[in-house]
């Protein structure tokens, strides 16, 4: 295997610690207890309220998915996150999935760099292929090429962020000659990237190759399935020279529904579980909670369940919870966030910090990653030359020269798809 790029992760201690938050798949589902189906406008307003409340109760991260079909509303995550970013101060804004297969890498590079600037660096993203098959032809792609698309598009995205002037030719989009994506990443440091996977080992391999994070969705499958993916990612992260397996950057999804009394939680959530399409009308709620991380009960039960996650997966950096799905009304979701932020997360922070080895990196933040590149020195402030975008006959497009871009290898670089 050829040389891999330098790591995208920060291993500086004391900058990010462990992050807790929520993610939304943006479903619009009928409330089975009232028969009310929210309008798109209602759900969009509600998701902003939910994200703002997440910050108010002390959570670190809000993430939203990307879908281009009903019954989902989140077709433009960057628009939503920019609006939320303008109304929050500390909340890290992320995606549950950014579709690397059907979005143009040029647009991803520019949109998320812009979001970085608007939020002062409070942004990262989870790359994924999505789980809606028809989205491929809707955007002119072939689902049978899903994995090669993901590999080629991400290699181009990294090049667009790492290099001011890009010459590129691949299989799935037109060539680029002397192209510069704008704006350049904030402080000369691109957004941190997680690679999300439910079942694909090649995505874990890709995350490891680049030294990026690996986010295991962890909501619909047994722990043994994700243990295999995470173990593979950790081993390959070390293989590519980014650190030890324990220094790999891992995020987990999860689900919870709580009440002070556990039986009250079971009674209240059962109609939502039994009727929500997301659960597929398959196993009983009891069987599903046994097989997956879904925890329906008291806050202490949620604490106990998630404090044990590192026993299964090792020390990790980010824990997100799915809280606003299955038709739950806004009032209930906000009450769930009160319990999550007020009773669960403070205890989990302490429990998961206990006996955490010093070499285990904290969760990545923009500030930590900037410090890893520049130390205490000045950061890059990209100032264009007067060439008007002519990168072919005039020198570089900017007054300064960025550091040399990481060298792509043959496994997941552009050469892999030619």
Go through each PLM region and give its residues.
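N-terminal beta1-alpha1-beta2 module of alpha/beta enzyme domains
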Residues: 1-93, 190-191, 374, 390-418
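Internal, glycine-rich beta/alpha segment that forms the wall or movable "lid"
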Residues: 2-17, 33, 104-212, 224-227, ...
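Conserved, mostly hydrophobic/aromatic
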Residues: 20, 54, 58, 66, ...
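Hydrophobic faces of well-ordered beta-strands that scaffold small-molecule active sites
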Residues: 20-24, 62-64, 93-96, 123-127, ...
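Active-site mouth loops of central-metabolism enzymes
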Residues: 29-45, 97-106, 188-199, 290-300
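Glycine-rich, proline-tolerant flexible connector loops at the mouths of alpha/beta enzymes
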Residues: 61-84, 99, 131, 218-221, ...
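Alpha-helix-loop-beta-strand connector modules within alpha/beta enzyme cores
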Residues: 71-97, 149-153, 338-349
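Aromatic-lined glycan-binding groove of carbohydrate-active enzymes
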Residues: 202-208, 226-234, 241-279
């Amino acid at each position: 295997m050829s040389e891999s790029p330098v790591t995208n992760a920060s291993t500086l201690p004391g900058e990010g610690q462990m992050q807790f938050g929520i993610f939304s798949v943006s479903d619009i589902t009928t409330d089975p207890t009232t028969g009310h189906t929210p309008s798109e406008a209602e759900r969009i307003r509600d998701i902003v309220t939910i994200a703002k409340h997440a910050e108010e109760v002390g959570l670190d991260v809000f993430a939203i998915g990307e879908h281009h079909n009903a019954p989902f509303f989140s077709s433009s995550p960057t628009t939503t996150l920019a609006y939320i970013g303008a109304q929050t101060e500390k909340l890290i804004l992320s995606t549950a999935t950014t579709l690397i297969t059907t979005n143009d890498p040029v647009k991803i590079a520019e949109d998320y760099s812009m979001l970085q600037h608007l939020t002062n660096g409070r942004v990262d993203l989870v790359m994924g292929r999505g789980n809606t098959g028809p989205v491929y032809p809707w955007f002119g792609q072939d689902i049978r090429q899903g994995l090669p698309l993901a590999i080629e598009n991400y290699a181009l995205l990294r090049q667009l962020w790492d290099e001011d002037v890009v010459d590129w030719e691949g299989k799935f989009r037109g060539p680029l000659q002397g192209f510069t994506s704008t704006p350049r990443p904030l402080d000369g440091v691109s957004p941190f990237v997680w690679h999300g996977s439910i079942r694909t080992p090649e995505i874990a391999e890709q995350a490891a190759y680049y030294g990026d994070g690996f986010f295991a969705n962890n909501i619909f499958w047994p722990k043994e399935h994700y243990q295999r993916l995470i173990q593979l990612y950790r081993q390959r992260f070390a293989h590519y020279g980014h650190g030890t397996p324990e220094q790999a950057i891992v995020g987990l999804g999860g689900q919870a529904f709580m009440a002070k009394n556990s039986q009250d939680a079971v009674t209240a959530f059962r109609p939502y579980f039994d009727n929500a399409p997301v659960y597929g009308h398959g196993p009983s709620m009891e069987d599903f909670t046994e097989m997956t991380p879904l925890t329906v009960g008291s806050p202490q039960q949620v604490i106990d369940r998630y404090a044990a996650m590192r026993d299964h997966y090792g020390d990790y950096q980010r824990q997100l919870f799915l809280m606003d799905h299955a038709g739950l009304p806004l009032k209930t979701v906000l009450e769930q966030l009160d319990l999550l932020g007020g009773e669960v997360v403070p205890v989990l922070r302490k429990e998961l910090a206990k006996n955490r080895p010093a070499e285990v990196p904290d969760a990545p933040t923009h500030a930590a990653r900037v410090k890893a590149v520049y130390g205490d020195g000045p950061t890059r402030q990209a100032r264009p030359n007067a060439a008007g975008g002519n990168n072919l006959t005039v020198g570089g497009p900017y007054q300064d020269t960025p550091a040399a871009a990481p060298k792509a290898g043959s496994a997941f670089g552009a050469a892999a798809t030619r």
